[in-house]
Amino acid sequence: MGATVDPITATGTHPRNVDGQAITIAVFSSVKWSGRIWLPLLFWAVTLLARVEAWLRRPPGTLARLSFIHFARWTLVRRIPYNGAPQQKEKLSYPRLFFESNFNGGWEEYIDAFSHILTKGMILFWGTSYGFPQPKPTAPFKQYIKENELEASHFYSAYPQATTTMVLAAHDLERKFDAFKGRIEGATPDAFAEAWRAFLSEVQADL
Amino acid sequence: MAAADVAPVDRADIQGNILRAYGKAYDRTSYVFTHLEDPAGGREWLGGLLSQVTSDQERPDPKLRPDETLNVAVTYSGLQALGVPADVLKGFSDEFRAGMAARAEILGDTGESAPENWEDGLGTGQAHILVTINALTSQLLERALDALKAGVEAAAGVTIVYHQPAQLLDEVREHFGYADGFAQPAIVGVSEHKLGGGIPEEGKWRGLALGEFILGYEDEDSLPPGRRLPSAPAEPLGRSGTYMVFRKLAQDVALFRKTLREAAALYENGDEEKLAAKVVGRWRNGTPLVSSPDAPIPGFDREDMSNNAFRYLDTDIDGARCPLGAHIRRANPRDALGWEGLDDSGLLAYRHRIIRRGMPYGPSLPEDAVEDDGEDRGLVFVCFNASISRQFEGVQTQWINDGNAFHLGHDKDYLLGDSSTTNKMTIQGKPPDPPFFLAPQAAFVKTRGGEYLFVPGLRALSAIAAGRWQ
Amino acid sequence: MSNRAGQATAFMAITPIVAGKEDELRAYLDGLSQDESPFALLPRTHFARWVILDDWNDEKSQPKKDHLLSRYLIFTSNFDGDLSSYLDELCDKLAPQAGELWGRCVGCPDGAAGEALKEYLMHNKINTGFFVAAYPHLRVGDVKRALDTRARLIDFAVSSQGMRPAELQSAFNAEFLLTDGSR
């Protein structure tokens, strides 16, 4: 009698949620009355903040700097669209907060990062959801996420072998490489070699 | 959490060599795996061993230390072979129940390191009980082994399926020539004096909660108000126990030396020793690169705790001293995964610590030899942790077999690689010096076999031997 | 309400699965492989997925239990540029798949393609509240090109180590200037 265990990949989540290095997570949580008012306000505020930061060219906020997240979104589902019979009209007793994200690394590490680094952020977004335990201790919080997580049926990444840090490094590297190519036009071999060494030193964090 | 809040450690109930190492005087070890044909016979044999099992109890006089120590661990198939019922078995962790061979993909044990290529007896479910004997001399080890074998002969349905002897090398180094076995975790109530072994906080180090290593105690996640204990098998089996990882890792010393030699030709005028230090993050005598980037400290004392109290972010954020992908920086990042402006910079690393108690095996390759002599040599890697998946597997999958956490893409640990190949390794240069690259190449280390085991506390062992499960 | 982050867009549609067709739909999704994902036909797509929502999960602390009357197919996508032209592409390129998936949903137009399908998806759209992207200005093509350049640069940096200047320069030119269309 072998132990029957769910197929767990190195990422700690079901294989269907994984494409190469990319991991996806989707969570629905039921939202209290207070959330109906709070969440739209929150979304408006953080969206505005993000736009202001972009306009001011200030470094992006903590969430965007968590270097293993490609994309993340929160959505409040208040009603399910109706398409006529034979669909039955849904009446939601509670709106549902939908969270979706694509990231790298392990599922556990991802949730840990939210617990430790985005602690206040967690409470802002999930504080009005039923059953939301505190971000720490992490064990009940991970349990909560697991219970409310939806497994993907088909998940696609356009660049599955790349992690977010690789994408950011590649982008930074490309810019600097273009500048380098401009600098070495018509250079002698010795000047080229020196410039190459200087370039490698400049981009070593991207390699 | 302060030491005063913590439950006192029941040292007599915890097996030895976990919280406190037996020490380098015990320089000979044998790892003996047995197979149990019959539950009753197996339990009886286990019962016969109980009085010899060495605990973590304080010895009143260190000079009265025993000639040898004996410890017992059990695989999942071993628990089944002992007759542990299904509802009790469910309390053990998923990865332990699956076994190390089933986790091969995750661990990077593919190609030549894949379980189908492992040595007979390991990874097939045949290995049930691991008896580890440490002794002060080889004669004492022989004597203890003979006694064990006699007991196995006399017992009903017990056979030895695997035996690996091991012994410390000179200066407690491992086969690639690096000082090993030190810089272990600092644990509250046990070893807080190990500066640098705990969690880096603002200006100080905090010991890790005991429950990160021993079941039945609060771990780092046991926060107020609930202060819940981490999940563990139910009493009496769970308390004072821990999970153990056993991996026989064969090392190709000749290949490693040859690779370093060839690569060093282009590195800083052939400084092979420095290149060797860059791969690991410590000079061969144990001096950390972060503390002393240009030369090892002569007579470096690895037992001096203050030598281990270094961090990365304050002086070496870019890896100019200790490369970002160096072995020790990967295996224990300390504050290196820290977050800008965050006080508790060790928070993304602190729940992945392990206690290492492995031993080298096989004869040393003569110094300066760069051709393999065909001898089997390497490291019996042994570690202890409360959660194999979070701790050992977490380190192996996220930090050793991948580089993303360190912004190194898919670069793996250059020393361990994986079964087929290492990737490149970038050795960061101090501006204006450019980085130096170690080219991808065949792996120096191969997995020859392994098991996940449970190390019961002493009362738990008695209960198992008596068939008393609840 | 924010469906955009930089030039990237988030889209979500929830469509009710025709009663009795859930197993077929699920089987079809199970049969899709990531290596030959239909989404590869939409090169503006960074990440996308289909998820089946069987029912809500209820928390113990909820006063009432909530149950869905149908099963739903959820489609989410993170892609480049504006929604309207993306849906045009989807309704054109993904016609066969659309039939197998949305074709099994209530209210889907016959043929599951073109303008009618686009209207159907827009009708079932759920607007995103807050959308964050790590690289909001990079399109899929930008990402892939940069990743490729990085891989080639790394290979070159490793293999050219120790070359004398003249050899280094000519090797560099051969790798990056003659074969690389864009200087």
Where is each model-derived feature located?
Chain A
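Short S/T/G/P-rich N-terminal loop/turn motif that feeds into the first structured element of a domain
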Residues: M1-R73, R78-P81, E90-R96, N102-E109, ...
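An amphipathic, aromatic/His-enriched active-site/gating alpha helix that lines ligand/cofactor pockets
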Residues: N104-A139
